[in-house]
């Protein structure tokens, strides 16, 4: 049921170009787009093992719901979502890498553009610095093109890859290493002083209600604006659209009351052609 994603060198980020010549003997890639795919459970178990203990992995039922997005029909002016997982297996059929993500496109008459929310990425230590990570960062671009076509947009429309990252902290070297890896690849950070960003409170609704306090998480979006990686500013309207797309994705599974403070902050963002600084992700 799964199939191999296309290895398109032109989709590699500027800092990931060496991946085009990487030797990855025996690595087999699987693009998973259905919970019925026999490889899905392998990918889900791996992500849950690595991200579940720190409270950063969704429940199985949430991912099953997201896969149902993939068969939705376009509705004018409404968002379309496409959830997918990439699994890389080594010659012994062990997990070499796994990532999941959601492509988001608003259908016409909305402007043609695609946002890709990069959820989780895990690379086995044996394959770090091998060039595998570069491909795992590039594969979602082809899914974005597929969704643009489904929405009846032009395939050359702008594509932005987005990862939500912790704000850099001197006392958190692991976070710093992740930020530096994306920085080297060509990602830029939205200046949090100009457009502060919140991730939803991921606790169960009952836990939120019992605590009496909603706790959205301050984070920072880091972006790869495909084809515009060297630019150090972006218009506010473009960044607003990217964050709107991410919040539209979350709003499909979160209660309106839990999303309300995030939308309130979004509405207060600058708009129009106001230039928003795009910083180095590791910059404190």
Question: Could you describe each region identified by the protein language model?
Answer:
Residues 73, 144, 208-209:
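Alpha-helix boundary/capping detector
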Residues 123, 128-151:
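Conserved acetyl-CoA-binding loop-helix of GNAT-fold acetyltransferases
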Residues 109-111, 128, 173, 232:
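Short acidic, gly/pro-rich beta-turn/loop elements at beta-sheet edges
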Residues 33-34, 44-125, 147:
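A conserved beta-strand-loop-helix scaffold within acyl/acetyltransferase catalytic domains
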Residues 55-58, 144-150, 187-192:
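Short, surface-exposed, polar/charged, turn-prone segments marking secondary-structure boundaries
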Residues 1-39, 46, 50, 152-284:
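Terminal substrate-recognition subdomain of acyl/acetyltransferases
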Residues 99, 137-140, 163, 187:
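Polar/charged side chains located within well-ordered beta-strands of beta-rich proteins
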Residues 83, 113-116, 131-135, 139, ...:
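Short, well-structured alpha-helical interface segments that form or flank functional binding sites
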């Amino acid at each position: 049921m799964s199939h191999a994603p296309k290895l398109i060198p032109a989709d590699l980020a500027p800092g990931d170009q060496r991946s085009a010549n990487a030797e990855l003997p025996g690595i087999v890639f699987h693009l998973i787009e259905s919970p019925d795919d026999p490889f899905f459970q392998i990918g889900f178990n791996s992500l849950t093992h690595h991200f579940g203990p720190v409270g950063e992995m969704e429940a199985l039922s949430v991912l099953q719901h997201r896969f149902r997005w993939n068969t939705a029909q376009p509705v004018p002016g409404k968002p379309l979502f496409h959830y997918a997982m990439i699994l890389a297996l080594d010659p012994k059929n062990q997990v070499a890498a796994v990532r999941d993500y959601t492509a988001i496109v608003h259908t016409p008459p909305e402007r043609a553009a695609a946002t890709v929310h990069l959820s989780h990425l895990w690379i086995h230590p044996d394959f770090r610095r091998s060039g595998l990570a570069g491909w795992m960062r590039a594969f979602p671009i082809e899914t974005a093109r597929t969704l643009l076509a489904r929405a009846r947009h032009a395939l050359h429309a702008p594509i932005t890859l987005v990862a939500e990252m912790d704000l850099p902290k001197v006392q958190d070297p692991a976070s710093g290493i992740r930020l530096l890896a994306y920085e080297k690849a060509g990602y830029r950070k939205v200046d949090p002083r100009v457009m502060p960003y919140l991730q939803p409170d991921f606790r169960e609704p009952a836990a939120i209600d019992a605590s009496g306090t909603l706790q959205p998480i301050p984070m920072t979006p880091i972006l790869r604006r495909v084809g515009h990686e060297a630019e150090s500013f972006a218009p506010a309207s473009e960044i607003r659209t990217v964050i709107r797309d991410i919040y539209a994705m979350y709003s499909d599974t979160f209660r309106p009351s839990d999303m309300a403070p995030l939308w309130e902050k979004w509405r207060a963002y600058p708009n129009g052609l106001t230039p928003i600084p795009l910083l180095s992700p590791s910059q404190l």
